[in-house]
């Protein structure tokens, strides 16, 4: 392991964190704060990108090193978020919005896994 790769992972993380903030702000502006659509969006998009990344590595279109670390750990690690997803659901529970909470859990899990599967299989060799 080199310090250069750590720097690239950190750079990917910085870009991912900024992207997450921008997506969240855009979603609040467009849809309001009634449902955590920003968290859902970054989780689904990030899962799709992860599927594409792994397919690119599997097809040998990208070298696993450093791309899995820079994009997978750095960028996507900062873009997607389980802690915010968890807190969004705690807040929905506290508001008594159990239907919204259930929808949020189901949508995040189903859409994120589906997006990862689609991204991966979209680029895999037949």
Curated annotation (Swiss-Prot):
GO CC annotations, alphabetized: plasma membrane
InterPro entries per UniProt: FluC
Membrane topology (UniProt): Multi-pass membrane protein
UniProt keyword annotations, A-Z: Cell inner membrane, Cell membrane, Ion channel, Ion transport, Membrane, Metal-binding, Sodium, Transmembrane, Transmembrane helix, Transport
Predominant location category: membrane
Location of the protein in the cell: Cell inner membrane
GO biological process terms on file: cellular detoxification of fluoride; fluoride transmembrane transport
Sequence positions that bind Na(+): 77, 80
GO MF term list: fluoride channel activity; fluoride transmembrane transporter activity; metal ion binding
Segments traversing the membrane: 3-23, 37-57, 70-90, 104-124
Pfam families listed in its UniProt record: CRCB
Regulation: Na(+) is not transported, but it plays an essential structural role and its presence is essential for fluoride channel function.
Catalytic activity, as annotated: fluoride(in) = fluoride(out)
NCBIfam families assigned: crcB (TIGR00494), PRK14200.1 (NF010796)
HAMAP family to which the protein is assigned, alphabetical: FluC
Family, as annotated: Belongs to the fluoride channel Fluc/FEX (TC 1.A.43) family.
Function: Fluoride-specific ion channel. Important for reducing fluoride concentration in the cell, thus reducing its toxicity.
The protein's name in its UniProt record: Fluoride-specific ion channel FluC
Biological classification of the source: Bacteria, Pseudomonadati, Pseudomonadota, Gammaproteobacteria, Vibrionales
Name of the gene this protein is made from: fluC
